[in-house]
Amino acid sequence: MRFLFPGLMALSLACAGLAGAAMAGPSLAGPNLAGPNLAQAQDSGMVKLETADDSRGWDAVGKLVLGKNGFCTGALIGPQLVLTAAHCLYDKTTGVQIRPEEIEFQAGFRNGRAVAYRRVSRAVTHPDYRYAATDQLDRVANDLALLELSQPIRLPSLLPFETGATPVEGDAVDVVSYAQYREEAPSIQEACKVLAGRRTALILSCSVDFGSSGAPVFSIRDGVAQVVSVISAKAEVDGRKVALAVPLAEPLAALRQALEDSKAASLRGGKTVSVISGGTRSGAKFIKP
């Protein structure tokens, strides 16, 4: 995985709860990845969705409050299902999973109020995700989690997003996220680009920061926004800030199966717990935002 993207430098998980632990990150050496797409890696156009009109159609994106561990971003992909990044579910200090009941999804949170509030009753990560992986790029692979809410969200104004096929290099994508210093309302960045891609990760020109982890990456097809990827980390390529995202199309089936397996285990007499892989403390380093 170390040479997945040549030229990738100083990877940093983008969970807001990690902001206080920022420190210089190691470089991942590799040949130059210069090119016409990377020359435009720092797209602009971040727009804050501060009003009901601004947010119309995006309220299924929400703030995921992680108990006392900060927040991430999540997206509703079913009445009772929220998609986010797997690393959001771990305490950054201990490496121990956060109990599902400590997590709250605040759909469409804006200026102190959410369209809907739901506690999480169950959380699963992708079966191949390893929080404790020593190689930072390995931590991006399969960095996906599926959360089951305590009750479905059924509101005419808040419809779950569809999911879609993985975008390819050169495709335009949108990202809706919360982040450090803009946690009171979501922001949208439209028409950033897929700069490079592999089966397990994408490099995007989108702007992300702590708190953006788990944010949905959208492709707009026939006027419909489809979630195609999830933000995992921020990084640098040849000195340019980029975002790393996890493709969704292939891993989603495994995530759904992990959730069903967790439910089945509970019915057999086990407790309702999150099914988390690799729960030991990580040695990952973080760069300053």
What are the functions of these language-model segments?
Residues 42-56, 90, 96-153:
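Conserved catalytic-core segment of clan PA serine endopeptidases
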Residues 85-88, 228-237:
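Short beta->alpha transition motifs characteristic of CBS
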